[in-house]
């Protein structure tokens, strides 16, 4: 659902301080958006807070791109 994708991108944009245009599905958090491991932890915490879900560490490790995050969160929250 576009609404979830928009919220996810809002969180990424705010947490990483990157322009929205860079938030393509294939954009890697680390290689393309300049995130480090702490940034990833903070992103996951914000996703959990925004969507009121728990993201296990083993799932969080699989969230490498914007598209990964959107697909995972939409599946998790029924989007």
Swiss-Prot record:
Residues bearing PTM O-(pantetheine 4'-phosphoryl)serine: 37
Post-translational modifications: 4'-phosphopantetheine is transferred from CoA to a specific serine of apo-ACP by AcpS. This modification is essential for activity because fatty acids are bound in thioester linkage to the sulfhydryl of the prosthetic group.
Protein name in the entry: Acyl carrier protein
MF (Gene Ontology): acyl binding; acyl carrier activity
Pathway stated in the Swiss-Prot or TrEMBL entry: Lipid metabolism; fatty acid biosynthesis
Any single GO CC term annotated in Swiss-Prot or TrEMBL for this entry: membrane
Species this protein is from: Gemmatimonas aurantiaca (strain DSM 14586 / JCM 11422 / NBRC 100505 / T-27)
SUPFAM superfamilies: ACP-like (SSF47336)
């Amino acid at each position: 659902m576009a609404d979830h994708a928009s919220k996810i991108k809002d969180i990424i944009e705010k947490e990483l301080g990157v322009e929205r245009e860079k938030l393509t599905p294939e954009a890697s958090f680390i290689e393309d958006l300049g995130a480090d491991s702490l940034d990833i932890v903070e992103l996951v915490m914000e996703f959990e807070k925004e969507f009121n879900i728990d993201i296990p560490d083993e799932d969080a490790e699989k969230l490498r791109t914007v598209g990964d995050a959107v697909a995972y969160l939409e599946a998790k929250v029924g989007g």
